[in-house]
Amino acid sequence: MGFPRNDYLTAARAQNHSDDFISETLSYADGLDCKGLPVIFDQHHLSYLLYMEHRELKQFVRSASGYYKYFAIKKRHGGLRRIMSPYSELRDVQTWIKENILDKIEQPIYVTAFAKGRTIMENARMHEGRKYILKVDIANFFESIGVRQVYVAFKKM
């Protein structure tokens, strides 16, 4: 799709934005656009790209836990693993982010989980012949990640 640079310039000038502001925002936009990533200026802009109301997007952020159904499955070696499955509205947003952003970011070779085109066999090959393998299961991993951490991770892209 590409960032509509000329349309942005016309609109920014019509809104009397300073040359410095326009230059900074174009630099930001060009950095993302050249990587094939969508340009997102703020939550309002993201909601526009997602074809949803801004208030709905804000509600996802404010009370994310309310957009998941919870259930448990048995672990191989006893105990239960809590599963959080997003309802369709949130899943649609997550899918858009995955397809339009995350799938376009090249992952380091050692990242295999959830990396497009990588398999569990590739992960196993990296450990072949090793004397020790450390297996870690971090309790409540996804729940422990806050909005600020997500913002910082995406900002670095």
Regions found by a protein language model. Name each.
Residues F71-Q94, A113:
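Short, conserved non-catalytic motifs in the polymerase core
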Residues S47, Q94, K98-L102, Y151, ...:
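Generic solvent-exposed, charged/amphipathic alpha-helical segments
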Residues N140-M157:
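Glycine-rich, acidic/polar active-site loops that bind/position phosphate-bearing ligands
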